From Swiss-Prot:
GO molecular function, one term: shikimate 3-dehydrogenase (NADP+) activity
Name of the protein: Shikimate dehydrogenase (NADP(+))
Active site (UniProt): 71 (proton acceptor)
Top-level taxonomic group: Bacteria
Reaction(s) catalysed by this chain's protein: shikimate + NADP(+) = 3-dehydroshikimate + NADPH + H(+)
Chain residues that bind shikimate: 20-22, 67, 92, 107, 221
Documented EC number(s): 1.1.1.25
Function: Involved in the biosynthesis of the chorismate, which leads to the biosynthesis of aromatic amino acids. Catalyzes the reversible NADPH linked reduction of 3-dehydroshikimate (DHSA) to yield shikimate (SA).
Similarity-based family: Belongs to the shikimate dehydrogenase family.
Gene field: aroE
Amino acid sequence: MNPCSTPSLYGVIGYPLGHSLSPLLHNTAFRELGIPGVLLPWSIEPERLPAFIQSVRLLNIRGACVTIPHKQSIIPLLDRVTDRVKALGAANTLYWDGDLLCGDNTDILGFMSPLQADPPSAEQTRVLVLGAGGVARAAVAGLKSLGLNQITITDIVDASSATLAETFDLKTIPWSQRSEVDAHILINTTPLGMKGKFEEESPYPTEALAARQGIAYDIVYTPFVTRFLREARAAGWKTIGGLEMFISQADHQFLTWTGRNLPQAAKQAVIDALTAT
């Protein structure tokens, strides 16, 4: 990076934002590739979002990662959104196309990436999605894009799973009966297992893992290995951690902004940060 260059400004917005890995990932990439850019964390209360978008336009902010609770409410504030945003009703990426401030959703691409790199076998066709929030919507859309259409959805809140099931024409089952589904692929989109008050919890009964084998995919990436993944691995399941999805969706964001992919050093910086805690 030329020290005399004025860096392009990017950000990650959410509320509360907490400790985001996006600045570490993207700023390491800018530095490694010699791109004059910096990504800053911005904690934006919901009522301040319209004013923030005005600031994006006025201050020539070149892009942003968007996280909860803004993924839906930001859409009407933009000039244009991609078909992925229209399909999912959520945007996680801001970028410019000429004079148009646009929104995209790279969550679906990030979710699909590890399943495309190492696809399920021809026999692994039945999927159980645990949780029915925004990430679950991206997961379901990604699964369908991969031709995996035998999907059952379950959530602690029955109404949430019913809404998602109706939108995507899925089967639904009560949370208490989730272990009764004969699924080859288990996908956790809940916060169960996340570092903090849920860290010692798992979204799926331990004893049920022994009944079959398949793929266990956890979108949670803090801690690096969740209880769900640890127990699934011990039972012989292939496991996919949430960091793979996080890095892949961020790679698509970085590519949109710069035309370059994230370098390995940026990915390793995030892995090192997670495994050090």
